């Protein structure tokens, strides 16, 4: 395991180690990528806990098992040593992400955008997104200058999202402020 991880500002969380698997140092990983197996495309991970960068590890192998991945990391051969990694977030530098088509965004790109309704009212800023199964949901929290102090859950759908202006840091939405 290497102790020279990338800058914390450049890292994006793509998964989390949540337990051990077997006795040979494998770990169970919950992947935030879609599809789940895309996490295995990144061979070097930065592990962190509670927001602080901790260490870099190298992926040896991984396999899909039900709704999680079972992963073997270089130099990790003991169940008890593997148990110490439970709870660590798996991060990779954002520059390793593939380019997207026009009009497509990674969640981290949407976080922090101001959300403005069709009447020009500031509803708040996107704090984070949730995967619900049917569609993604934006958690919009109040900010300075927002209409009120309400937290809103807005669907990330074509019907709701009218326009995204990354340069201005804004998203226009079709949404009733009273809802």
From Swiss-Prot:
Gene3D superfamilies: PRC-barrel domain (2.30.30.240), RimM (2.40.30.60). The keyword Hydrolase does not apply. Pfam families: PRC_RimM, RimM. Residues 102-179 form the PRC barrel domain. One of its GO terms (cellular component) is cytoplasm. One of its GO terms (biological process) is rRNA processing. Keywords: Chaperone, Cytoplasm, Ribosome biogenesis, rRNA processing. GO terms for molecular function: ribosome binding. InterPro entries: PRC_barrel-like_sf, PRC_RimM, RimM, RimM_N, RimM_N_sf, Transl_B-barrel_sf. Its main location: cytoplasm. It is found in: Cytoplasm. The PRC barrel domain binds ribosomal protein uS19. Binds ribosomal protein uS19. An accessory protein needed during the final step in the assembly of 30S ribosomal subunit, possibly for assembly of the head region. Essential for efficient processing of 16S rRNA. May be needed both before and after RbfA during the maturation of 16S rRNA. It has affinity for free ribosomal 30S subunits but not for 70S ribosomes. Belongs to the RimM family. This is Ribosome maturation factor RimM. The gene is rimM.
């Amino acid at each position: 395991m290497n102790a020279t991880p990338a800058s914390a500002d450049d890292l994006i969380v793509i998964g989390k180690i949540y337990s051990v698997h077997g006795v040979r140092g494998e770990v169970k990983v919950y992947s935030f990528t879609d599809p789940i197996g895309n996490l295995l495309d990144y061979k070097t991970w930065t592990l962190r806990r509670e927001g602080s960068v901790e260490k870099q590890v190298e992926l040896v192998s991984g396999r899909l098992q039900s709704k999680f991945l079972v992963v073997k990391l270089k130099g990790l051969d003991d169940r008890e040593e593997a148990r110490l990694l439970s709870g660590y977030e798996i991060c990779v530098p954002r520059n390793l992400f593939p380019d997207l088509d026009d009009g497509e965004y990674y969640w981290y790109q949407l976080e922090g955008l101001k959300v403005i309704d069709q009447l020009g009212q500031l509803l708040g800023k996107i704090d984070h997104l949730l995967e619900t199964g049917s569609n993604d949901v934006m958690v919009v929290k109040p900010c300075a200058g927002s209409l009120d102090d309400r937290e809103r859950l807005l669907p990330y759908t074509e019907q709701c999202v009218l326009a995204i202006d990354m340069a201005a840091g804004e998203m226009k939405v079709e949404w009733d402020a009273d809802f």
